[in-house]
Amino acid sequence: MKRQLIIGVMGGGTAAQTDVDSAYKLGALVAENNWILLNGGRNAGIMEASAKGAIKNGGLTIGILPDATNTNTSEYIQIPILTGMGNARNCINILSSNVIVACPGGAGTISEIALALKNQKHVICMNFDIGTIFDKYKEFIHHTKKPENAIEIIKSLTAI
């Protein structure tokens, strides 16, 4: 039996409204493709928006949370995984995802990109300029400005 794709959507807990809107649309498109959306599970920013987009469009969401309690968990996360691991949970986010979409964020998002590339996972940077620091891994890095294009890249990478 073929497993469903798990799309990791990484990004900041604080984000510009345009990035929140794009994350919502991305979540909706992930759901429409019958993929599972995985993110950091928080009730803010990119995490909240992408999960909301997926749920509102019939998707399944998994949140890998840094805490040992549900205090800051998004209401749009159906399967919260409480780790109590803090930022170390980023390893679970990345290793559990088939493809990563990195939305604007901070050091946490950069660490997730680094972990993904180190593990030879493809990263789609959506409206997120990561500069040249990861040029060594350019075969795994893809850039787009639109959620629809991110979906097309995922399909081409996974031969769907």
Where are these regions (language model features)?
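Short, hydrophobic alpha-helical segments
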Residues: 154-160
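Flexible, glycine-rich phosphate/dinucleotide-binding loops
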Residues: 16, 70-71, 132, 150
